[in-house]
Amino acid sequence: MKNVIAAVLATTALTSPVLAEGITEFRIGILGGENAQDRLNSYECLRAYTEEALGVETKLFAPADYNGVIQGLLGGSIDMAWLGASGYAKTFLSDPEAVEPVLVKINLDGSYGYHSIGFARKDSGIDSIDAMQGKVFGFGDPNSTSGYLIPSIEIPTYKEGITMESGEYFDEVKFTGGHEQTIVAVNNGDIDGGVTWADGQGEWEDGFNSGALRKAVDAGLIDMNDLVEIWRSAPIPEGPVVLRTALPTDVKAKMTALIDGMYEQDKDCTYAISAGESLGFDPITHDAYLSIIEARKLKSK
């Protein structure tokens, strides 16, 4: 690990880590979607790199839900996080000056989009949204882009008569709490179908190249051959890595450079923090999320 850290720092012109100006610790928030310990394990490599790069104690925080990370960023108790697009939209709408989007995960084909994937158990006989009529449908977290915002808007346009209210088209519509919870609930037969996120690239059997299904496969939670895709959203812009705007300029520059250069120096760490295979992270700006911000505004009316 020490050798890899040195290589990353050299690549990003951080060859002499010193106490970062104006801070005594750095706090990284990790969105929900899988159990807290797995999230902490996935981000441990980034925590170690950050501590070496900034020269201050670095802590990981894995709140129970998306809102815990969002409120941490807004309140100044979290300095950096990889948000979903909807989570970024909520943060921006709450306080436009709270955070800066700096980087985005890049797929193996060079794109930075992903999909909300609807899925069910193969042995249920459910193979489409049509077959979900009268069944139990699961969302993840209310602040998830792919686990709630986009499917709640797009699925009702699939055909006339679909709503996302319990007792109408679906027998029940419920929130499971996160992506992993939705996947496990469908796999166990606790709900009939649900939605999660994936880049939509690669093989179904692998859980695609990256996303919550890939993480679940890697963790041994599911066999994708037991599941079937029943719906797919239009492409969604991948959420941004954000930094708290009030951080010192040198800290923001070091952290942006560190993550931007991670793929070249430590592909295993990149795999861990990006939920599967990717080409690492590239710069992104606020303008990439204008459509999601508008969708979030409309949903709140």
Which stretches of residues belong to each language-model region?
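Sec/Tat signal peptide C-region and signal peptidase I cleavage site
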Residues: 15-20
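An extracytoplasmic/periplasmic, membrane-proximal ligand-sensing/linker region
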Residues: 23-30, 34-45, 51, 243-301
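Beta->alpha turn/N-cap motifs
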Residues: 62-66, 77-95, 104-105, 179, ...
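A conserved helix-loop-strand patch within extracytoplasmic ligand-binding domains
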Residues: 104-163
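Periplasmic-binding protein-like
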Residues: 24-31, 101-117, 211-247, 253, ...
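Hydrophobic residues within well-ordered alpha-helices
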Residues: 73-74, 132, 186-187
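Pocket-lining segment of extracytoplasmic ligand-binding domains
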Residues: 142-248
